[in-house]
Amino acid sequence: DLDGLTLLGERQHKFLSEWGKKQNSSVMKAVLSQTGFCGGAHLHGSKENRLHADLDSNGWPQKGRNKALKLIKEANAVHIAGDQHLATVIHHGIDKFEDGPWAFVVPAIVNNYYSRWWWPKNEKSGKKSNKVLPWNGRYLDGFNNKITMHAYANPDSDSSGSGYGIIKFNKKKKEVTFECWPRYQDVR
């Protein structure tokens, strides 16, 4: 991490800080951003193109990323993003694993021209894996950010991983459900 780099501007920090302090038991909060706050994809464009650290993500600069995540967590908000061409559900870590907010990066509506994959180099599950998918659990991304991968939709299905996300807020139970659907699936 380099000193002097910023991720969010001062107005954005101020807004998140003030918004986060407004607590109302009947309100659930979400922060929307163009892209995720970590390197949630390893392979870009093809299975032969492994990136160590994706500079197209908001995973850097780390100080800026961590400051933003702390504000999102203090607001008791979830993070919803796009732009990564790979649907993921990640529990962010700031100082330690899982001490940050939850994030859902929704899939791309079209994903067959520049796909991305979650594919750890060692092809092993991380610690605390839920065993639902082969490569979930605790990992460090290419920027050394702590992330816990809970779900991902690699482009190895008929839909190439393209689709859309639905986020359901249950105010009574104080629960958020992230759903990922193939592009042509009618979920009515």
Show the residue positions of the predicted features.
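Long, structured stretches of catalytic cores involved in phosphate-ester chemistry, encompassing
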Residues: 1-188
